[in-house]
Amino acid sequence: MTDCFVGIDTSNYTTSAAVCTAEGEILANLKMPLPVREGECGLRQSDAVFAHTKNLPSVMQKLPEVLRGNRVLAVGYSARPRPAADSYMPCFLAGIAAAQSFAAGAGGAPLFEFSHQEGHLMAAVYSSGAPENLLREPFAAFHVSGGTTDVLLAEPAGSGFSVTRIAGTEDLNAGQAIDRAG
């Protein structure tokens, strides 16, 4: 039996779930882009919530097969765009509900709340090949996603990050292009 972690994210562009082992091996990386009509700049939050509500069953139904014979140690989920008190988007409510339901069905696995931005930062840390170095001290990160194109100071804090915006633009286009490309 392998110990695993499950992650769920419902951003304004993609319904996502992932499974990784305690050693960091990715067993599943499931993504379903939300439909954005041609010529549109994005989705209204109500449309994103509706799309996630439609997508989540398809994504979540694939997890039991991936997890068969394994043990879920914890479930992490994105609850907001950034790790800030005033950061809120309704699209994350669908993922919160899915994560809470999944954790309850997985024997009451502990839940860990993160921001979407922290998910991007942690993905960059682990794909660097040297996460133990980056998780010891603050580092600068160039973050391009959805509504942001920023240079950030990321300081490891508990299981997430304390994030300070050093510089950035108000331009949505670069972040939208990255999110739509997946």
Indicate residue ranges for each PLM-predicted region.
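Short acidic/glycine-rich loops and adjacent helix/strand connectors
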Residues: 1-182
